[in-house]
Amino acid sequence: MRYKAVVEYEGTSFIGWQRQHGVVGKSVQESIERSIKEFCQQSVIVYAAGRTDAGVHATGQVVHFDLKVSREDYVIKNALNHYLRNEKVSILQLERVDEEFHARFSAKKRHYTYKISNREAPLCIDLMRMWHVPKRLNVENMREAASYIVGKHDFASFRAKDCQSKSSIKTVDSIDIIAAEEEININISAQSFLHKQVRITVGTFVECGMGLYPPAHVLEILEKKDRAAAGITAPAHGLYLTRVDY
């Protein structure tokens, strides 16, 4: 029986979503798999819609796994949350789904939010939940830069050097930059992204907002198809996987 769950986690506690052999620390995947084994004594593999990096948070990660036992959805959800009580992981929703459902390959769109604190004073409470950029950013310039990113492009300049994707061509469906007082939220959606594409995109927007180059320079970055041409990689702790559409 296949189950789908919506998961929330605080990413700074983990080495990322995926199990990594030879790396010190725990992954979100391992933590959930361990909770399932404690619940029903069954070893399973949990698959996720987004393989988030170390430090990246999630408020709407979607996973699936197969169980041999049959229980009410709420029983499984409550049991897993019980066994996850000492981890910074929470099962928000859980339901039985068709055997054809796959958390990663069935996904139609992934939604991320990047949170920036644009104030002069250092952060305390949100230190590992937002990127602190003390220099005042020109949000309108950032929005113009974003307009050049939306659509189908070769994003070779916006992917990590170790990205294993065969093609760097992706379609970004939408980018909304919302500024409220000292906080800037960048919402970006696509069916899929290259490794670190969102963080490199945000880093480029921030450099544009600082006045390091004009918004239209993003077009030159795209044309160069070279990681060195784009901006810095924004810190992981400002990024959230917020929703996955199916």
From Swiss-Prot:
Active-site residues, record numbering mapped to chain: D53 (nucleophile)
EC number: 5.4.99.12
Protein origin, superkingdom: Bacteria
Catalysis performed (reactions): uridine(38/39/40) in tRNA = pseudouridine(38/39/40) in tRNA
tRNA processing found in the keyword field: yes
Keyword Oxidoreductase listed: no
Enzyme class: isomerase
Biological processes, Gene Ontology terms: tRNA pseudouridine synthesis
Keyword annotations of the record: Isomerase, tRNA processing
An MF annotation (GO) of this entry: RNA binding
Residues reported to bind substrate: Y112
Family: Belongs to the tRNA pseudouridine synthase TruA family.
Role description: Formation of pseudouridine at positions 38, 39 and 40 in the anticodon stem and loop of transfer RNAs.
Subunit structure: Homodimer.
Protein's recorded name: tRNA pseudouridine synthase A
Lineage: Bacteria, Pseudomonadati, Pseudomonadota, Alphaproteobacteria, Rickettsiales
